[in-house]
Amino acid sequence: RINSVDDKLHAFLSVNDSALEQARNIDKKIKSGEKVGACFGMPISIKDNMCIKDTKTTCASKMLENFVAPYDATVISKLKKQDAIFIGKVNMDEFAMGLTTEFSAFGPSKNPWNIEHVPGGSSGGSAVSVSSYECIASLGSDTGGSVRNPASFCSTVGYKPTYGLISRYGLISYANSIEQIGPLTRTVKDTAFMLNLI
């Protein structure tokens, strides 16, 4: 799906080349009767300000273009334990400072409902990737609307949790005292599911 629509939408900054291998490993677990996590086989995108070990984390900035995260954010560790498949890192306003996802050093994302319109931001890539069925869920971050705004613009569900509910360890945050990691999905039920896991 990413290959067929993302040239036009530009939700993704990078795609995880090992995603299919991860899926095959989950298939092996199922065939062998091993217990699988609650997210088994779910393709999930991650805003590019959250650390995934050994993966580029750019914050949509040329300043961090070659930064490779040395550890996993807590939310990533939790989703890995649930057998989530990280499909890739998604676009955002540079350092999460914006509400349109036009201010990425790697180019703007487009609204999947009308590419002449902005998708909102700063978690625009998250909302676009979910709305256009490139993934089932995404994690974004929200200081003053950065999950809720693009969710509204792209007709998805976005939730900013109460401050302190979700660990921010491994988030390169814009405003440490108020920023939260939150899920974006296509339904309220899926958002609640993701929130309970992270």
Language-model segments: residues:
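Gly/Ser-rich catalytic/binding loops embedded in alpha/beta enzyme cores
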Residues: 1-144
